[in-house]
């Protein structure tokens, strides 16, 4: 009969702290791994954020302007959405069109939308 995960969890749950410590050490020796916590960088301070150049941008449709139909067409082309979804985005401005894009792509999207008559922000 094979041991199930539930059996292992039940056995580990009944161990004392000292027994768990010994178990962790045995895992480290047997498999050549370390149970040390991985250091995670905290949030950068305001000064560090300014010094580091932003690499990902969000393109936000601020308003559709007078040429809504043209803006809807461009939004559909950029996002690949259907007509109704693109219209809902344009009607619900301000809305994010694309997230996490490169600066060049964000500027290209901004140019396309502005040529169609929209007002666009890059964040």
Swiss-Prot record:
Per UniProt, what is one Pfam family of this protein? Ribosomal_L12
Per the record, the domain of life is: Bacteria
Q: Name one GO biological process term.
A: translation
Q: Does the keyword Ribonucleoprotein apply?
A: yes
A molecular-function term among this protein's GO annotations: mRNA binding
Q: Which UniProt keywords apply?
A: Ribonucleoprotein, Ribosomal protein
Annotated coiled-coil positions are none
Q: By its UniProt entry, which InterPro entries does this protein fall under?
A: Ribosomal_bL12, Ribosomal_bL12_C, Ribosomal_bL12_C/ClpS-like, Ribosomal_bL12_oligo, Ribosomal_bL12_oligo_N_sf
Q: Where would you find the membrane-spanning parts of this chain? A: none
Q: Which GO terms describe its cellular component?
A: cytosolic large ribosomal subunit
Q: Which family does it belong to?
A: Belongs to the bacterial ribosomal protein bL12 family.
HAMAP family found in the cross-reference section:
Ribosomal_bL12
What does the function comment of this entry state? Forms part of the ribosomal stalk which helps the ribosome interact with GTP-bound translation factors. Is thus essential for accurate translation.
Q: How does it assemble?
A: Homodimer. Part of the ribosomal stalk of the 50S ribosomal subunit. Forms a multimeric L10(L12)X complex, where L10 forms an elongated spine to which 2 to 4 L12 dimers bind in a sequential fashion. Binds GTP-bound translation factors.
Q: Under which name does UniProt file this protein? A: Large ribosomal subunit protein bL12
Gene source species: Neisseria meningitidis serogroup B / serotype 15 (strain H44/76)
Q: Which gene encodes it?
A: rplL
């Amino acid at each position: 009969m094979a041991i199930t995960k539930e059996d292992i969890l039940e056995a580990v749950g009944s161990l004392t702290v000292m027994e768990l410590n010994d178990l962790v050490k045995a895992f480290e020796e047997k498999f050549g791994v370390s149970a040390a916590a991985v250091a995670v960088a905290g949030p950068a301070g305001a000064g560090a954020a300014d010094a580091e150049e932003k690499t990902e941008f969000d393109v936000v449709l601020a308003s559709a302007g007078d040429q809504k139909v043209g803006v809807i067409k461009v939004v559909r082309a950029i996002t690949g959405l259907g007509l109704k979804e693109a219209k809902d985005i344009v009607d619900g401005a301000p809305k994010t069109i694309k997230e996490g894009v490169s600066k060049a792509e964000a500027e290209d999207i901004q140019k396309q939308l502005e040529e169609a008559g929209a007002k666009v922000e890059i964040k």
